Amino acid sequence: MPVVWTIARKELADGLRNRWLLAISLLFALLSVGIAWFGAAAAGQVGFTSVPATVASLTSLATFLMPLIALLLAYDAIVGEEEGGTLLLLLTYPLGRGQLLLGKFLGHGLILALATLIGFGSAALAILALVPEVEAAILLGAFGRFMGSSLLLGCVFLALAYALSSRASEKSSAAGQALGLWFFFVLLFDLALLAILVLSQGHLSPRLLPWLLLLNPTDLYRLINLSGFDAAAAGGVVPLASDLPVSASALWLALALWAGAALALAHGLFRRRPI
């Protein structure tokens, strides 16, 4: 375990040196504070509206940003080390491939955790300080759920990035595959489900479609954050799952299983990768 933490600290130090942590934190802070105050500007209203509306808007934003940032952070974790000549050097030490992968996962996860806490937490603190009529318990509960699930979603895509990096032959290939993966889960998946729903002309059981959302971690993420709120705010196919007989804890478990399965896949691919 000390070896794993050594790798994790090295990745965190690289993130600090490369300004990844600073850039992600500033991006999250600026966008989240902007959405909290100007999210309803299109309707002619400027200022904080409500906790559900703010969380729904932030969830839509993070659905696009968090997977992309995680993929960009980790797509070259393996193939980049190999191209730089450091992977072979690292594996000459008493360090297993699983330990190396876990250390990178923890290090990159710490970068995302700190950026999420600093960036999105600043929006929560700003709302508490500037909007006295907001109930602190409701706000902190909603933002706590939002930040925790955002981090878990990021961990899913970190692990998927490791899987891509473990099978890619060069960094440019891994980058292209990472963007393709982001496009599929964030944009194409829901469009495909809507197309299937329309083209089936009622032949597809309406009970089946909501369960298909569990196959997409970004839809799981949206369901977690919109539980208890108006699911229609999510748009897309997520409102179809408003009557899904699954508890919030089961949704959390499903998203955690996504992260575990993706990390196991990455480990399997990395073990079979010739060095």
UniProtKB/Swiss-Prot annotation:
It is a multi-pass membrane protein. It is found in: Cell inner membrane. The complex may be composed of an ATP-binding protein (NosF), a transmembrane protein (NosY) and a solute-binding protein (NosD). Required for the assembly of the copper chromophores of nitrous oxide reductase. Could be part of the ABC transporter complex NosDFY. This is Probable ABC transporter permease protein NosY. GO terms for molecular function: ABC-type transporter activity. The keyword Electron transport does not apply. Keywords: Cell inner membrane, Cell membrane, Membrane, Transmembrane, Transmembrane helix, Transport. The chain crosses the membrane at residues 20-40, 60-80, 111-131, 146-166, 179-199, 250-270. It comes from Pseudomonas aeruginosa (strain ATCC 15692 / DSM 22644 / CIP 104116 / JCM 14847 / LMG 12228 / 1C / PRS 101 / PAO1). The gene is nosY. The keyword Transmembrane applies. One of its GO terms (cellular component) is plasma membrane. It comes from the Bacteria. InterPro entries: ABC2_NosY/YtrC-like.
